[in-house]
Regions:
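Amphipathic alpha-helical hairpins
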Residues: 1-133
Length: 133
């Protein structure tokens, strides 16, 4: 069973007019970013001077989890609520990407996390572009 199969089997409200392919890509990107940010936060929390990075990664992981869970409930989907959540996820992912990118050359964990954040922000932007007006 894939998430995509489950999504197609679920009753939809506003989500019926939404691009489920973009939604699935966004769910997958949020999941990958959640994992990368959680691991980066754990790695950076024990390093001197990396408290801001660890905190930013933890915040990004929390936002990605909320975004992912929201999209996994399509029956209660409301584009007017989804839009600001996607915008918030994009903003947090971009901020985390900037923070991790600033130490990417000294930390492979940060480099990979920055890439996951960039992918997530892009997937959220693609999902945002599909929402009905």
């Amino acid at each position: 069973m894939s998430t995509d199969e489950m999504m197609k089997a679920m009753p939809m409200a506003d989500a019926a007019t939404m691009d489920t392919t973009a939604m699935q890509a966004c769910i997958d990107a949020c999941s990958a970013c959640l994992q990368a940010c959680t691991m980066c936060s754990a790695a950076m929390s024990s390093m001197d001077g990396m408290g801001r990075c660890a905190s930013m990664c933890a915040t990004c992981a929390d936002v990605c989890l909320a975004m992912m869970r929201m999209m996994m409930r399509p029956a209660s989907m409301d584009a007017a609520v989804l839009r600001p959540m996607l915008e918030a996820c994009i903003a947090v992912c971009r901020a985390c990407m900037a923070e991790c990118s600033s130490h990417a050359e000294m930390s492979e964990t940060c480099r990979l996390c920055a890439m996951a954040c960039e992918d997530c922000a892009s997937a959220c932007e693609a999902m945002l572009a599909t929402l009905p007006a």
